A protein has these predicted regions:
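Phosphate/diphosphate ligand-binding glycine-rich loop within oxidoreductases
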Residues: 1-95
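Glycine-rich adenosine-cofactor-binding loop
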Residues: 81-84, 91, 95-125, 133
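Short acidic low-complexity segments
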Residues: 153-173
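A structural signal for isolated positions on well-ordered beta-strands in alpha/beta enzyme cores
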Residues: 14-16, 105, 128-129, 159
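NAD(P)-binding Rossmann-fold cofactor-contacting core
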Residues: 123-149
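Redox-cofactor binding/interface segments in oxidoreductases and associated redox assembly factors
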Residues: 42, 177-178
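A short helix-to-beta-strand connector/capping loop
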Residues: 11, 35, 73, 149-160
């Protein structure tokens, strides 16, 4: 998908996949950028570990506690997380869905949810509910994000709970996202 995108814009890049493990990540990153690499995309299980190797990280990466992109600029490595922005762009441009004033349910409280929730909140939904099989994990995610995201001036109803009928069926939803 990345190579197809580059080809659409006549960008001269090589996009390949390399097998990297948590044990080899630091050496691989050092060698890649030392050899003139400009940037990389990162997937599981390395997103959280990769955060530690960026000289600077974006607010999105900080909120997600993970990065899926590291790029070189001015002799520094910058880490970012584009998961949330990618979802928003797809919803708005391809599906013509706006999130403002919508009631949204997110199923799951792992890394994918953590990566998309801040971008969803930026779009001013009416409510955002995180439901997870392990209720405590949903509650911890909500609590952590509330401590990092400025919710002042927002009328957002932000809830978290388990996958119970009482919690899930208490509301209707405009959008359900399985993360």
């Amino acid at each position: 998908i990345h190579q197809d995108f580059a080809n659409q814009f006549d960008a001269k890049i090589e996009f390949r996949k390399d097998e990297v493990t948590p044990d080899t990540l630091e050496t691989w990153l050092t060698d890649f950028f030392k050899d003139g690499g400009k940037g990389i995309s990162i997937t599981l299980p390395l997103k959280e570990a990769a955060l530690n190797y960026a000289d600077e990280i974006s607010d999105r990466a900080r909120l997600a506690s993970a990065c899926n992109v590291i790029y070189a600029k001015d002799k520094k490595l910058f880490g970012d997380n584009t998961d949330g922005q990618g979802l928003i762009t797809d919803l708005e441009n391809n599906l013509k869905v706006t999130l403002k004033d919508k009631k949204i349910l997110i199923l799951g409280a792992g890394g994918a949810a953590r990566g998309i929730i801040p971008s969803i909140i930026e779009k001013d939904p009416a409510s955002l509910k995180i439901a997870n099989r392990t209720e405590s994990k949903a509650l911890l995610l909500k609590q952590d994000l509330e401590g990092k995201i400025d919710l002042k001036g927002k009328s957002l109803i932000f809830e978290a709970g388990g996958l119970t009928d009482d919690f899930l069926l208490a509301d209707s939803y405009d959008l359900v996202i399985n993360s």
